[in-house]
C-alpha cells in the first residue's frame, strides 16, 4: 500500500507542476473541465472502479460539467466526449487529425503490434486495413462465405433441437461457439472439428478476459514486472499457449497456398480465400519486410476476437429483448413468413434485404445495447480545438458510444426497446455517421469498424433464421434481466436463458 501511495503522490506532484506551468500560457484555450481539483484523484477513480465503474462516474460528471470533460487517469490527460455533434465534428469533419491511436503500452506492443484496431495511423495501418477491406470484407468476398454461414446455422439449430423445446438454453454459449467457428473458417480456410475449434476458442477467450488483469504492466512496466513477477509470467505463459495453438494453423495454411502455387492450379471452384492467405505476402512499407509469424498470429487473433465477441454479444442482447417482449418477436415472425413463406428451408441472405422490421429490430438492439460503450481511444496528430476547449497534440480522446445512442434529445424514451422508431423515417439512420451521428455502434470516420457490413449481415441472417425456426420463450422463474456487465464487451450480467420451441415439424 505504501508503494502505491508513493507512486500516486509522485505522479500527482509532477502533474500538478505540469498544470501550473501550462496555466502561464493564457493565450491558448483551456483543457475541458476536470472534476478533480487534484490530478491523482482521476487515477484513484480508475484504479478503484475500473472502466465499468468509470462509465457511471463519467455520466454524473457530464451532467455537471457538460459534454466534454478531462480526467487524468495516467500522466496524460484523457478527454471524454458524450455529445453526437462534437463527435461528428471530430471523427468525420476533422477525421485526419483524430485518426491516430495513443502510443502502444507494454501489453499492446506484444499482443497488438501491427494490427488494425490499435495501430498508429500511417502507411502500415493503411496497408493492413486496405487488405482486409478489399480481400475479405468486400461484398463479393463476403458472398463467397455463404456456405460457411449456412454450415454454422446448421450447427446452431442442431444444438437448439437437442434441448427439445423444454430444456432451457443458455444462448450465449451456443452463439459464441457458432460465431467463433465461422470466423475460424474465414481466418484459416478450413472447417476445423469441434475439439480444434474449442481449443482455439479457449486460448483466445483466456487472453481476452485476462487483459484487464495485465493492464497494470502498462503503468511503470519495469517496476510492476518486478513486484508482480508471477502475474507477468502468467501473461507470458498465455502467449506461449496462443503460439502453440495458432501457429500450426497458420503454417498449415501457408503450406496449402504454396502447394497451389507450385501446381499452378487454375480450378478455383472449391477454393475460398482465407484471411491468412492475404497476409502471407504482405510487405510492411515502413520496415521493408514481410509480416513474420508473430505479426500474422496477432492479426489472426484480432480478426477472431473482433468478429466473434461483438457479434455474439449483440445477438444475445437482441434475442433477450425478443424473449422479453414476445409481441415484438411475433411481429418479426409475421414479416419473415410474409417474405419467405412456409416451405422455404431457411431465410436466405437475399431475403433479409426485404425485411425492414428485421433491420429495425437489429438497429434498436445495437442502439440500446452497443457491445462496446466506448470507442477505442483516439489520439490527435496536432493541437486542435473541440467545443471551445483545447485537445493537445498526442492527447487521448474517448467517445462514449452508449451515451450518444441513448441521448434523450435525439431518442424518445431512450431506454425503451422500440424497433418502430426506425420504421417509416424519411431518411434512414446512417450507421457510418458520415451525414450526422445519431448512434455509432461501429464507430465513425477513418477508424470506423471495417467489418460493419459483415456484422450487419450476420446479425440479420441469424436473428431471422432463429426466429423463423423457433419460438423463443422465457423460462419460468428466470425473468429476462437486462443488467449490464463489462467484460471485453458489455454483456448481460445474467446470461439469457430461454426455451427454443420448434415452430415447424421436420
UniProtKB/Swiss-Prot annotation:
Subcellular location as annotated: Membrane
GO molecular function, one term: heme binding
Cofactor: heme
EC class name: oxidoreductase
Key words, A-Z: Heme, Iron, Membrane, Metal-binding, Monooxygenase, Oxidoreductase, Transmembrane, Transmembrane helix
Sequence intervals crossing the membrane: 1-21
Domain of life (superkingdom): Eukaryota
InterPro entries: Cyt_P450 (IPR001128), Cyt_P450_CS (IPR017972), Cyt_P450_E_grp-I (IPR002401), Cyt_P450_sf (IPR036396), Plant_metabolite_P450s (IPR051103)
Binding annotation for heme: 449
Membrane topology qualifier: Single-pass membrane protein
Gene Ontology cellular component terms for the protein in this record: membrane
First-listed, main subcellular location of the protein, grouped into a coarse class: membrane
Enzyme Commission number: 1.14.-.-
Family that this chain belongs to: Belongs to the cytochrome P450 family.
PANTHER family: CYTOCHROME P450 89A2-RELATED, FLAVONOID 3'-MONOOXYGENASE-RELATED
Name this polypeptide is given: Cytochrome P450 89A2
Amino acid at each position: 500500500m505504501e508503494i502505491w501511495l508513493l507512486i500516486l503522490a509522485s505522479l500527482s506532484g509532477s502533474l500538478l507542476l505540469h498544470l501550473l506551468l501550462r496555466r502561464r500560457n493564457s493565450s491558448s484555450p483551456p483543457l475541458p473541465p476536470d472534476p478533480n481539483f487534484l490530478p491523482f484523484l482521476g487515477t484513484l477513480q480508475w484504479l478503484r472502479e475500473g472502466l465499468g465503474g468509470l462509465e457511471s462516474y463519467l455520466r454524473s460528471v457530464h451532467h455537471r460539467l457538460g459534454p466534454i470533460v478531462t480526467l487524468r487517469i495516467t500522466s496524460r490527460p484523457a478527454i471524454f466526449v458524450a455529445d453526437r455533434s462534437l463527435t461528428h465534428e471530430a471523427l468525420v469533419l476533422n477525421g485526419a487529425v483524430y485518426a491516430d491511436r495513443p502510443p502502444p503500452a507494454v501489453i499492446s506492443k506484444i499482443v497488438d503490434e501491427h494490427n488494425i484496431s490499435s495501430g498508429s495511423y500511417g502507411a502500415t495501418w493503411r496497408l493492413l486495413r486496405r487488405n482486409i477491406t478489399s480481400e475479405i470484407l468486400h461484398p463479393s468476398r463476403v458472398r463467397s462465405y455463404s456456405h460457411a454461414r449456412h454450415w454454422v446455422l446448421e450447427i446452431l439449430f442442431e444444438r437448439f433441437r437437442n434441448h427439445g423445446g423444454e430444456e432451457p438454453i443458455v444462448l450465449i454459449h451456443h452463439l459464441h461457439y457458432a460465431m467463433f467457428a465461422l470466423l475460424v473458417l474465414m481466418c484459416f480456410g478450413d472447417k476445423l472439428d469441434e475439439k480444434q475449434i474449442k481449443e482455439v476458442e479457449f486460448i483466445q477467450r483466456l487472453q481476452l478476459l485476462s487483459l484487464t488483469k495485465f493492464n497494470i504492466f502498462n503503468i511503470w512496466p519495469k517496476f510492476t514486472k518486478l513486484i508482480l513477477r508471477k502475474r507477468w509470467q502468467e501473461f507470458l505463459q498465455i502467449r506461449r499457449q496462443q503460439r502453440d495453438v495458432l501457429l500450426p494453423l497458420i503454417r498449415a495454411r501457408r503450406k496449402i497456398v504454396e502447394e497451389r502455387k507450385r501446381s499452378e492450379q487454375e480450378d478455383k471452384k472449391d477454393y475460398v480465400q482465407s484471411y491468412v492467405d492475404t497476409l502471407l505476402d504482405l510487405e510492411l512499407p515502413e520496415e521493408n519486410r514481410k509480416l513474420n509469424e508473430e505479426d500474422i498470429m496477432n492479426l489472426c487473433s484480432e480478426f477472431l476476437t473482433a468478429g466473434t465477441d461483438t457479434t455474439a454479444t449483440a445477438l444475445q442482447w437482441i434475442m433477450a429483448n425478443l424473449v422479453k417482449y414476445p409481441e415484438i418477436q411475433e411481429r418479426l415472425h409475421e414479416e419473415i413468413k410474409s417474405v419467405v413463406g412456409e416451405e422455404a428451408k431457411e431465410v436466405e441472405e437475399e431475403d433479409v434485404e426485404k425485411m425492414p422490421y428485421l433491420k429495425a429490430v437489429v438497429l434498436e438492439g445495437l442502439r440500446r445495447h452497443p457491445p462496446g460503450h466506448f470507442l477505442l481511444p483516439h489520439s490527435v496528430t496536432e493541437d486542435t480545438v473541440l467545443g471551445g476547449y483545447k485537445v493537445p497534440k498526442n492527447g487521448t480522446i474517448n467517445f462514449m458510444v452508449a451515451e450518444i445512442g441513448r441521448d434523450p434529445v435525439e431518442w424518445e424514451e431512450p431506454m425503451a426497446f422500440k424497433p418502430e422508431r426506425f420504421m417509416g423515417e424519411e431518411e434512414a439512420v446512417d450507421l457510418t455517421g458520415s451525414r450526422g451521428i445519431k448512434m455509432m455502434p461501429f464507430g465513425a470516420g477513418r477508424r470506423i469498424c471495417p467489418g460493419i457490413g459483415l456484422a450487419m449481415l450476420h446479425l440479420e441472417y441469424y436473428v431471422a433464421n432463429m426466429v423463423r425456426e423457433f419460438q423463443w420463450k422465457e423460462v419460468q422463474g428466470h425473468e429476462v434481466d437486462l443488467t449490464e456487465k463489462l467484460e471485453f464487451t458489455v454483456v448481460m450480467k445474467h446470461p439469457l436463458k430461454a426455451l427454443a420451441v420448434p415452430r415447424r415439424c421436420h
